Amino acid sequence: MLRATAPCWFPPGYPEAKKVAEEAALEASRHLGGEQSQAGAPEGSKMLRATAPCWFRPGYPEAKKVAKEAAPEASRHLGAEQSPAGAPEGSKMLRATAPCWFPPGYPEAKKVAEEAALEAPEFPLPSHQPAQSFGLWVPQMHKQASAFVDIQAEPQNRGPAVPPAWPKMVTESCYFPAQRGSACRLPAAPRLTERPSGVRISAPRKRKTIAHSSSPCLVTGYTDAKRTRVASSSQRSRGSKVGRQPGKTRNRSGMACKTTATTSSKRIVRRASLPSLSLKKPIILRSSGCQVPTVLRRGYLQLFTEECLKFCASKQEAEEKALNEEKVAYDCSPNKNRYLNVVLNTLKRLKGLTPSSMPGLSRAALYSRLQEFLLTQDQLKENGYPFPHPERPGGAVLFTGQGKGPGDSSCRVCCRCGTEYLVSSSGRCVRDQLCYYHWGRVRSSQVAGGRVSQYTCCAAAPGSVGCQVAKQHVRDGRKESLDGFVETFKKELSRDAYPGIYALDCEMCYTTHGLELTRVTVVDADMRVVYDTFVKPDNEIVDYNTRFSGVTEADVAKTSITLPQVQAILLSFFSAQTILIGHSLESDLLALKLIHSTVVDTAVLFPHYLGFPYKRSLRNLAADYLAQIIQDSQDGHNSSEDASACLQLVMWKVRQRAQIQPRHRSASPAALACP
């Protein structure tokens, strides 16, 4: 038997294999002849020769020859037992395994396979194919398809290869049943809508990664259970004995999973914070081409609103006043620096206001107190206030020396440099001449050895060449054009009403016919701007006078309001009994072409120490009496700022006269007027 299997000991095609097989066949024939051969045939030889094709490697020429010789013997041997119809079953079986004799793709294999397919039995028979293992040729059993080959792709393995039967470890039998039992008692976890992350937050600004487990449901459920039990135990008792702690998650090696335990115990629960109860900020929309940042405007608007809430009756009123104050500051500020200067002064003013509904506050009482500060008829005439013309309707008359030019009507005198120049009938300069002038005033100061006079703009001596240059000469012209004036009239008032108290300020520019109105602002006794608008002059503008007026070409270009429209609006506000407050108010009334005699002039109320005709500037008065700095921008004056400063100066005078000190630091000018 051992020698019969000798062909398997040699590699395919080895010459010694055939010799050993033949010798083994004779011995096998003698040994098996008497027991298994009923017909007396050498059964051992037949069986060995029938398997001869397996002795050779696929495609070896001798294999086919031996197979053909073995086929008739196998047919005779198996015909009587397995083939009732007498078919050569041995030949069929051998030829059915013929494709295994040749290497894959060998041309002869396909032909033999097609012939064998017709004679192959219905049940699959084992076939043999050589396989190389450790240098020996070992036959390997497999099943051969009859006509088609099915190809199945192996599943993609994303992890290390795991044997189909993982050996059960001792730790699994110890810890896994307990985990499965606790997991079965836990409630089902909510289904996540997003892919769960492998990162847990253990402490602020620290992250720890949890290792992936083969049973994520068990690990997740157990971790959540531990989280719940720890929280409940900490809330039940504080300072009591520590009870039984839940077991930590174990891994396959039997060690506790420190990452999971640490993460669950130090996990920080995020909670939604409640919105703070703060004041809702008023909205300021962004505007294109704005030099003042919107964020800066919103910040100061919030500050204005907070201050207005202290003295306004309602939140809506406070927001409206804050929006109005911020809008006025923004409209009169062409750049950021000017805006900051204006809003800071406005904020100071708002901090000094108190509610207008305070006990003892009466506008009628304030009106009666201001009666003693009104200008008399002589003061009005002396300071150049206009009076109605006795003969010409719409005309005005001045009782001071009116500006008289040279004898020639086409000759004018420049109000800035004092040079005479010629003009045409339209008021334009006949010749283009540059104007050199000093925009500052002449001031005398005490120095060592005496007093020295110099200009405030450049510190130059009087009579020196001007430090500024203009394209052409200009003139005032207000005292020469005294037509188109309107006069305030008396109005019937109710018993509880009073005529009103307003502060007024105007800005002007130079035209071909002199100074004309370009902006007017009216402020009431509560420091509220009730009217503020730009005005389009009637004649051509030659110099916008931006250094003092703060009005630019863009401001005038976007307005269509004319002087007659402004006069109509002011007549609806004012009456003959209304008190108007201003600094050198005669210049404003001349620009408005308005005749009004109930006025309080701060230039007269706070006289210059040298007496008339000298007058103190509004800037110096505000600095001395109000501790405020105004008109400190190179972009020009602010009419609302000047009007408010005049009103505060008058209230300061009322308080001083009544010798009443304010009870609170944040007292309004109107409240300070009452005892």
Swiss-Prot record:
User: Could you tell me which CDD domains the record lists for this protein?
Assistant: REX1_like
| Source taxon at top rank | Eukaryota
> What InterPro entries does the database record attribute to this sequence?
Exonuclease_RNaseT/DNA_pol3, REX1-like_exo, REXO1-like_dom, REXO1/3/4-like, RNaseH-like_sf, RNaseH_sf
| CC terms in the record's Gene Ontology section | cytoplasm; nucleus
| A Pfam family the protein falls into | EloA-BP1
Q: Positions of the region Disordered?
A: 66-90, 225-263
Which keywords, in A-to-Z order, does the entry hold?
Answer: Cytoplasm, Exonuclease, Hydrolase, Nuclease, Nucleus
Q: What is its main location?
A: cytoplasm
Q: Where does the record say this protein resides? A: Cytoplasm; Nucleus
Answer yes or no on keyword Ribonucleoprotein.
no
What residue spans carry the region label GOR1-125 epitope? 358-483
Biased composition regions of type Basic and acidic residues, renumbered to the chain: 66-79
BP GO terms, sorted: rRNA 3'-end processing
Q: Name one GO molecular function term.
A: exonuclease activity
> What name does this protein carry?
Putative exonuclease GOR
